[in-house]
Amino acid sequence: WAALAVLGLAGCVVVPLEQPVGTGVPQMPTAGPAPATPSGARASANAFIQVISRMEPAVERECLQRRTQPINCDFQFVVDDRAGLEPNAYQTIDSTGRPIIGFTLSLIGEARNVDELAFVVGHEASHHILGHINRKSSAATMGSVILGGLISASGGSVETIQTAQNVGAQFGARLYSKDWELEADYLGAIITLNAGYNPEHGAQFFARIPDPGDKVLGTHPSNAARMAQVARAVADYR
């Protein structure tokens, strides 16, 4: 990981990418990141630095204003510089509770404009502000307890109960994931606007990725629903 400390900063589109912790935006489908020209790579890096420098204060201000619990609002932005990773971004927290937003180099290179980068930052930051990691953990625990309890009550074996608990945890974690993505799209659009970027322009990346549709246990809503959510946020903001 290459942290952006060198920038003087304090411091998740789609086939869904499973993260061990945190939340992520789905991946953009590519056969592999195309090698960038030096000038193209430099332009992408400069655009990313510009976006982070404007989005970070907007993100942290929104976090401080909206938080209902004593969560950490000192965001850290990092870049995963490992070669060969597909375009992706995600939000997680470190051992102290500090929020971290990570980006792969390929996502930075794939973004067509600063609005797309800004919207991704706003979306991922919103997952932390809205408490989605804790809510995901709670939902997973609830699903595990309920399904495991049902199997236990019916006389299931220890192995069967453990399997049911694992299945229940996965079901619980996915149950509200689409709603959480839409919530993050809405607040992310507001944060993007507050930083001076255009979230509707930024959300156009949805038009370039496979549509996850409306699968019952899917982790992401349809692209049309997400673009409509961004448009709704912009209309409400105005």
Model-derived segments and spans:
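Long, well-structured alpha-helical subdomains associated
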Residues: 177, 195-238
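C-terminal motif of bacterial Sec signal peptides marking the signal peptidase cleavage site
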Residues: 8-11
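Metalloprotease/metallohydrolase-associated module, dominated by Zn2+-dependent proteases
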Residues: 155-201
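Post-HEXXH active-site segment of zinc metalloproteases
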Residues: 132-163, 203-206
